[in-house]
From Swiss-Prot:
GO terms for molecular function: DNA binding; structural molecule activity; zinc ion binding. This is Capsid protein. It comes from African cassava mosaic virus (isolate West Kenyan 844) (ACMV). Pfam families: Gemini_coat. One of its GO terms (cellular component) is host cell nucleus.
């Protein structure tokens, strides 16, 4: 006959075991449900139905489709290898061509709900042997009033101290036009000892960024009329460049007002 566990602590130099006292019948507690320990409070309500969740999770949940838009969710990918310099480079993320497919926009207006930046930054074979540290700084910008055939250069938008990209801020006369939505960085190290020749970049941001085009069908910067989405990249080392192999995906919805 098995003994009933007692509420005692058996402590040895190697282990400490706590046993719980149980006054119920041994036949009643033979089949017990497994206990799931949840460390994060938010995850405790993920698999519950909506009517079983607290009021906070029902009132303040973000909608799947942005307001004023309609499905399905469309995807546009930008895949390119860039040479990131100290002076900075720019990529237009909101270039979407007009068409009937799942990678096209239906009309003039659409909303970029989220963006996924995936890839790596890496050093060349000759550069990685030099003893140095290089940081690549990414700026995700909103251009509220696009103008011209191409976006402005890094130095025309940002005000820097001693031409250092890590101190870059939007110029005072351009603050109403350009807005920094997200900023992040990645680091690579060259040299014979603590070499880190490549660094992974993996970022996912929710933006709800509304873009407006003109009557043209081509997805170009010159056809934007409102809210172009730009990605600026610059490295902190003055002489050694960094290569960036990135895949940028935007998830967008067409506007109802088209």
């Amino acid at each position: 006959m098995s003994k009933r566990p007692g509420d005692i602590i058996i402590s040895t130099p190697g282990s400490k075991v706590r046993r719980r006292l149980n006054f119920d019948s041994p036949y009643r507690n033979r089949a017990t449900a497994p206990t799931v320990h949840v460390t994060n409070r938010k995850r405790a309500w993920v698999n519950r139905p909506m009517y079983r969740k607290p009021t906070m999770y029902r009132m303040y949940r973000s909608p799947d489709i942005p307001r004023g838009c309609e499905g399905p969710c469309k995807v546009q990918s930008f895949e390119q290898r860039d040479d990131v310099k100290h002076l900075g480079i720019c990529k237009v993320i909101s270039d979407v061509t007009r068409g009937p497919g799942l990678t096209h926009r239906v009309g003039k207006r659409f909303c970029i709900k989220s963006i996924y930046i995936l890839g790596k930054i890496w050093l060349d074979e000759t550069i990685k042997k030099q003893n140095h540290t290089n940081n690549v700084i990414f700026y995700l910008l909103r251009d509220r009033r696009p103008y011209g055939n191409a976006p402005q250069d890094f130095g025309q938008i940002f005000n820097m101290f001693d031409n250092e990209p890590s101190t870059a801020t939007i110029k005072n006369d351009l603050r109403d036009r350009f807005q920094v939505l997200r900023k992040f960085h990645a680091t690579v190290v060259g040299g014979p000892y603590g070499m880190k020749e490549q660094a992974l970049v993996k970022r996912f941001y929710r933006l709800n960024h509304h873009v407006t085009y003109n009557h043209q069908e081509a997805g170009k910067y010159e056809n934007h009329t409102e809210n172009a989405l730009l990605l600026y990249m610059a490295c902190t080392h003055a002489s050694n460049p960094v290569y960036a192999t990135l895949k940028i995906r935007i998830y967008f919805y067409d506007s109802i007002g088209n």
